[in-house]
């Protein structure tokens, strides 16, 4: 099988297996290829008033939480440190909902009602981006991890989660 190396895109290269008898070696790809450790993903709410960018890998590690809020909304968490999140527009369109301890700040677009990101209780110095609100074109794959949000304190015994990005 002949491969046109010049026509391959980065996602195609990621899928190449190295080391097996029927695969291509790293030297065939060439040392000039660089696969970025992270990608800038853009996204926003339904009406478009709230827009943001988030820096994360192209293959996302997402948390699926079983708490009442996440289950009802279908939220899939991409949790990032604050310095990897940038709100581009819509600050004046956001409204905040808090409950229980008040640590988590659930931010909703006051026009369309979508929660595209928020400040989670588990990561109060970062953001949880709703992966369902990311624009098409930059995500190459997703790995889902179940999180026990119903028993939050047991899931995060030290009171804070770690970042995967």
Region locations from a protein language model:
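A short Gly-Trp-Pro
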Residues: 14-17, 22-165
């Amino acid at each position: 099988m002949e491969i046109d190396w010049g026509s391959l895109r980065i996602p195609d290269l990621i899928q190449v297996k190295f080391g097996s008898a029927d695969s291509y070696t790293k030297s065939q790809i060439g040392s000039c290829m660089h696969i970025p450790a992270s990608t800038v993903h853009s996204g926003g709410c339904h009406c478009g008033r709230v827009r943001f960018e988030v820096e994360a890998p192209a293959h996302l590690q997402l948390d699926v939480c079983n708490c009442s809020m996440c289950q009802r909304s279908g939220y899939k968490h991409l949790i990032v440190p604050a310095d990897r999140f940038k709100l581009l527009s819509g600050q004046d369109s956001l409204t905040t909902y808090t409950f229980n301890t008040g640590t988590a700040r659930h931010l909703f677009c006051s026009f369309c009602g979508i929660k595209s990101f928020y400040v989670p209780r588990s990561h109060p110095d970062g953001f949880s981006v709703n992966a369902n609100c990311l624009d098409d074109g930059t995500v190459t794959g997703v790995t889902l991890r179940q999180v026990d949000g119903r028993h939050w304190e047991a899931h995060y015994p030290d009171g804070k989660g770690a970042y995967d990005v």
